[in-house]
């Protein structure tokens, strides 16, 4: 039954590249076959509950701009929000959604009330998933908004906060498992510091390692089959976060023996904040064997903030999905739109239009990436660039020769290598040809 929030808008359909209907897909065709698989199954789109239904349109200089009928801290408002959210999911046709506990329930007086509220909403979600066919990509706990977490959750100097956070995560993993969630995410927005003057780095890292170990232990205890994911971000809201980027997270996982238990959920905007490209973070995660899922958005390249806009850069998406395809595609992960409307975008249809544009952009990127992969457009030049390592001398360098033996061969054979072109402009033109 319609809530009336979206008026008379009908389910979004694929109408093809020539369509000028802003409420139709021009490039995302869920059933189109790409590399032998349906486009929907490649992209595995998800809607973020927090930005789409919980964000009020505020910024550091001004408060709420959105006027939503569910904006109150009451359980009935949370139920209305759920009705609107699942109506939106059905209109858009994305197969998945994601949520934090605080997105979907009111803030209770204590842990017990929070848990009761969460379970009440999960009851509703279970029914709505059965009715609509929607699935949960991942669940997570909000361990950063409430003032109790101002000095962190897992890394808080107060053990009571650590305990409250751990108990909250336990309830959120339970909810995720109950809803058939395919992953569970941890984002350490307050796991870091503002100043080293009041921070014990060694203690805080050990506490974070202990916290994550508890999560992994509980996952196995209850038989949760999903993937545990960490989402890297260098700063904001803290000055420095411990899960700075993919490389930092991998080092952390190795230190605490969790590299085979936990993967990463990589956000485009967080990669940019860390001084990396999106494809760099994806390529490194793939190389290190910890690629899990992505949060799709974009940052404003001038402001330096994590602006969480909808993606609109097809060449960037092509290079990103090229890395996803090289990784073998998503398994339990997917493409979650961690993107929000601009605070002046007040109309209900703006929420659909933002997601439609993002899904079309990703579809174009996926198709370009698939063509590059099929044609060997980038892999063939790469193979040529490293061909010398496939020869007899290259293999001996990697698996037998000592340093003094190498020096002897260089002198005996008068090895005097000359540089070869990296052909960057040629490769960039290849990408432009496909997009």
From Swiss-Prot:
Location of the protein in the cell: Cytoplasm
The protein's Enzyme Commission number: 5.3.1.5
Superkingdom assignment: Bacteria
Catalytic activity annotation: alpha-D-xylose = alpha-D-xylulofuranose
Gene3D superfamilies (alphabetical): Divalent-metal-dependent TIM barrel enzymes
Annotated residues for binding of Mg(2+) 2: 267, 270, 306, 308
InterPro entries per record: Xyl_isomerase-like_sf, Xylose_isom_bac, Xylose_isomerase
Cofactor note (record): Binds 2 magnesium ions per subunit.
GO annotation, biological process: D-xylose metabolic process
KW Chaperone (keyword) present: no
Keywords: Carbohydrate metabolism, Cytoplasm, Isomerase, Magnesium, Metal-binding, Xylose metabolism
Subunit note: Homotetramer.
Full protein name: Xylose isomerase
Origin species: Brucella suis biovar 1 (strain 1330)
């Amino acid at each position: 039954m319609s809530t009336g929030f979206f008026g008379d808008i009908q389910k979004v359909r694929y109408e093809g590249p020539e369509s000028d209907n802003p409420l139709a897909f021009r490039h995302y065709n869920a059933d189109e076959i790409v590399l032998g698989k349906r486009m929907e199954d490649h992209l595995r789109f998800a809607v973020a509950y927090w930005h789409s239904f919980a964000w009020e349109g505020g910024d550091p200089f001004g408060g709420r701009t959105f006027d939503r009928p569910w904006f109150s801290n009451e359980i009935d408002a949370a139920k209305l929000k759920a009705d609107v959210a699942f109506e939106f999911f059905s209109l858009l046709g994305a197969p998945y959604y994601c949520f934090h506990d605080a997105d979907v329930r009111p803030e209770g007086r204590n842990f017990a009330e929070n848990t009761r509220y969460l379970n009440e909403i999960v009851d509703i979600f279970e029914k709505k998933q059965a009715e609509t066919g929607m699935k949960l990509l991942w669940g997570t706990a909000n361990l950063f908004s409430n003032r109790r977490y101002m000095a962190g959750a897992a890394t808080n100097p107060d053990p009571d906060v650590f305990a409250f956070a751990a108990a909250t995560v336990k309830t959120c993993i339970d909810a995720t498992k109950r809803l058939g969630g395919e992953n569970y995410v941890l984002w350490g927005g307050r796991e870091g510091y503002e100043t080293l003057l009041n921070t014990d780095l060694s203690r805080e890292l050990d506490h974070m390692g202990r916290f994550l170990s508890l999560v992994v232990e509980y996952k196995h205890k209850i038989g949760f089959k999903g993937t545990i994911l960490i989402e890297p971000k260098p700063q904001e809201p803290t000055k420095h976060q411990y899960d700075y980027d993919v490389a930092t997270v991998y080092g952390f996982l190795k230190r605490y023996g969790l590299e085979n238990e936990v993967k990463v959920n990589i956000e485009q905007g967080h990669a940019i904040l860390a001084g990396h490209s999106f494809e760099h973070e994806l390529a490194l995660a793939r190389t290190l064997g910890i690629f899990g899922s992505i949060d799709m958005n974009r940052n404003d390249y001038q402001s330096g903030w994590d602006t969480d806009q909808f993606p609109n850069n097809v060449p960037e998406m092509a290079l990103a999905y090229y890395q996803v395809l090289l990784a073998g595609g998503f398994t339990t992960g997917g493409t979650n739109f961690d993107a929000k409307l601009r605070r002046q975008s007040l109309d209900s249809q703006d929420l659909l239009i933002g997601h439609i544009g993002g899904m079309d952009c990703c579809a174009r990127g996926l198709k370009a990436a698939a063509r590059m992969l099929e044609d060997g457009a980038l892999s063939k030049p790469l193979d040529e660039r490293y061909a010398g390592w496939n020869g007899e001398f290259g293999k001996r360098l990697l698996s037998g020769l000592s340093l003094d033996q190498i020096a002897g061969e260089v002198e005996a054979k008068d090895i005097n290598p000359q540089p070869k072109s990296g052909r960057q402009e040629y490769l960039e033109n290849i990408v432009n040809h496909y997009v």
